[in-house]
């Protein structure tokens, strides 16, 4: 979202945005198959602030192909300079039967990283990244309230906390899940069978 697109806040009542930055390193973004750059993210983030959004989350990822502890620290510090209200820090997990897994090979990522001999961080490096996340975010006033989620006081994600408390939530759109009075159900995943958002079924 850029520029005038941010006016959705005034029309829809949306008051929180989440940006999937993942990394401030454009080479790492390319290896993840992301189509945005760090500069694109900065432009959108700035537009969101100018539009009046006062509750913003930024996603970052560690243990990426060819990522180092130093490059990850740079990503964290770049995000912290922006002072978002919430930061989600995830460690990459490569799952079978996903597009990322299918195109995952040592040679591909070595080439993409400019000939680096190592394409995934070691377990020791992953642990250092995890420790760095906790310490650096705590130093800047972010409280860890879930495994991967950190927030300034009062900005914990109500949606996430609601899951743990089994609170009611209604999912809108194709394939969206809901929980109401301890009953889980979800919308159809087929567009042509869903003439109305009320077309749901129990699961």
Language model features: what each stretch is:
Residues 4-5, 9-194, 198:
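C-terminal scaffold of the Radical SAM
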Residues 201-202:
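Basic polycationic patches enriched in arginine
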């Amino acid at each position: 979202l850029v520029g005038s697109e941010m006016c959705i806040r005034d029309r829809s009542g949306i008051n929180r945005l989440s940006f999937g930055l993942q990394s401030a390193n454009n080479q790492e973004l390319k290896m993840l198959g992301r189509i945005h750059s760090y500069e694109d993210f900065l432009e959108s983030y700035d537009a969101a602030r100018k539009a009046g959004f006062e509750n913003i989350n930024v996603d970052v990822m560690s243990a990426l192909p060819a990522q180092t502890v130093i490059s990850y620290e740079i990503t964290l510090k770049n995000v912290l300079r922006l002072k978002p209200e919430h930061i989600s820090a995830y460690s990459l997990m490569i799952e079978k039967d996903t597009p990322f897994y299918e195109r995952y090979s040592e040679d591909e990522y070595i080439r993409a990283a400019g000939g680096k001999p190592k394409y995934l961080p070691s377990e020791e490096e992953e642990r250092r990244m995890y420790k760095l996340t906790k310490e650096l975010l705590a130093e800047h006033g972010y409280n860890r309230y879930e495994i991967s989620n950190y927030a300034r006081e009062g900005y914990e994600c109500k949606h996430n906390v609601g899951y743990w408390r089994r609170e009611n939530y209604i999912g809108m759109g194709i394939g969206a899940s809901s929980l109401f009075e301890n009953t889980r159900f979800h919308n159809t995943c087929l567009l042509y069978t869903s003439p109305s958002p009320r077309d749901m079924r129990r699961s």
